[in-house]
Amino acid sequence: MSMIAHVINPGISGVKLACAVIEPGQNPAFPSHLQVSLTREELPLEAAPDELGLDALAERILEQTAAWPAPDAVVGRGGLMGRVPAGTYHVTPELARYVLENVSGSQPADDPNPGIGAPLALRVAQARGVPAYIVDPQSVDELLPEAHMTGVPGVRREARFHALNARAVARRAAYEVGKQFREARVVVAHLGVTTSVTAFDQGRAIDTTGTAPDGGPMGARQSGPLPTRAVIRLLQTQSESELLRLLTRGSGFFALTGTADLSEIERRQEQGEDSVVQTAIAAFVHQVCKAIGEQTAALPGRPDAVALTGGIARWDAVVDRIERRLAWVAPFIVLPGELELEALAEGAGRVLLGLEGVREWTPEGVTLRPAAPLVQVETVEEV
């Protein structure tokens, strides 16, 4: 039995789309490891999604996907819904309205449109007569209570990290080392424009460095850890919004080398004569290794795998340095780029195939509907 999901992932310059054919896996020992075949397309945008309007954007998606096989569900990238457990969520008009109205003003450079995935998925799903889902939204929070605490009463560490991609990579890494995701310990380092390093224990992200502007090693544009007094001095010369932009978009390799183009930085590194690039790479590797060590220590035992993902994981020279330094920790699994389209499709597939229950969200809390094969849903009101 196969299922079809239409996948919607809004980005900086366009909307990534995919038609996913989802089938049960071939290994009965790993029933949740699905086989997913994606047909990918991109809908380029000449203006920001909020300027185009959600109705117009949904119409363009419907036009571009009109020739695709009819879906069993539409799945989009999630938004900020308060602190919620990981999983696949049924998109209702109430949820779609909430994520549109609760968009943080300090989104990192690689997460510009966190509020539109759910309402877009709902509009397209309503037109197709199928349910809409989101998977592992940005505000997933399953951290240990002590991981939230700081030494200052009232100041709390938040759980903002690359939840969708990191969980998908952790699942894949567990499978690669022969472990069920809900039995494995995995450390995932997402290395890209922004970064985060996260410890997964038995299917839960129990601790994380966070990502810009709250934490994580330096990235292509992310600052990495800063001394507190330096941040205080910076606030004396610029506004909060200016400082947030500096920490999330104007720092890291971009500030140190003059470019965030990783292929250009790699070219300069290979020439071996650019001391600025060599020093920046050394600092990056040092910070990533420290962060992996920190998250390893958050686990109740040795990890089964360390996984590297994100755009910088394509950079062999950097990956080799990290692996050599930390080879003693656990086997390394390298999954370059991002698996967001696959993660969205797989999350919908686990629900459609009855392998996992679907979560229902309201402002008052989250409930889990028991796992069951897909059933027809009733028509819901417009957002």
From Swiss-Prot:
Positions of transmembrane segments: none
EC number: 2.7.2.7
GO biological process, any: acetate metabolic process
CDD domains named in the record: ASKHA_NBD_BK
Disulfide cysteine pairs (residue numbers): none
UniProt-annotated location(s): Cytoplasm
Keyword check for Glycoprotein: no
Keyword annotations from UniProtKB, A to Z: ATP-binding, Cytoplasm, Kinase, Nucleotide-binding, Transferase
Primary location group: cytoplasm
Molecular function as annotated in GO: acetate kinase activity; ATP binding; butyrate kinase activity
Catalysis: reaction(s): butanoate + ATP = butanoyl phosphate + ADP
One Gene Ontology CC term in the entry: cytoplasm
NCBIfam families assigned to the protein according to its UniProt record, in alphabetical order: PRK03011.1-5
Family designation: Belongs to the acetokinase family.
HAMAP family from the UniProt entry: Butyrate_kinase (MF_00542)
UniProt protein name: Probable butyrate kinase
Organism: Deinococcus radiodurans (strain ATCC 13939 / DSM 20539 / JCM 16871 / CCUG 27074 / LMG 4051 / NBRC 15346 / NCIMB 9279 / VKM B-1422 / R1)
Taxonomic lineage of the native organism: Bacteria, Thermotogati, Deinococcota, Deinococci, Deinococcales
